[in-house]
Amino acid sequence: MAPGFTYEFLPMKTEPKFQPYIGLEDHFQISAATFLNQLGALWFHTPNGGLRDKNIARKFKAMGLKPGVPDILIWDQRQGFSGYAIELKCGRNTPTDEQAFWLNKLQSLGWKTLITWSLDEFIFEVESYYGIKTIAQSLKV
């Protein structure tokens, strides 16, 4: 991460009635999504997180939802990698065993992987992946 260079969470376009349901990691995810959309990346978010009703959880599992799949999967191939798998974390959260399994498996299949607790690092690393030279990268020591 570049010293002295900080990104704020990007503005969200959500209705006020949904604001109470948006936590810190949700803000991180929405900011990352906003950035990736502005970048024009081919990507998606796997909706694995969050609390769900038991019936909905059973339905999703039956439909093939897998625990531990990284938060963000970027399908654009760059720098010899098949794609970029990114796990977003907040606070003192650490990767689960399932998340570590997926990241290691994707890495063995030629994917670049990242676990990050910072929007700054996320943006910096994604820009690096795409070969984008920015002010933040020129400040890296």
What are these regions (language model features)?
Residues M1-V141:
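Catalytic phosphate/metal-binding cores of nucleic-acid and nucleotide-processing enzymes, i.e., regions
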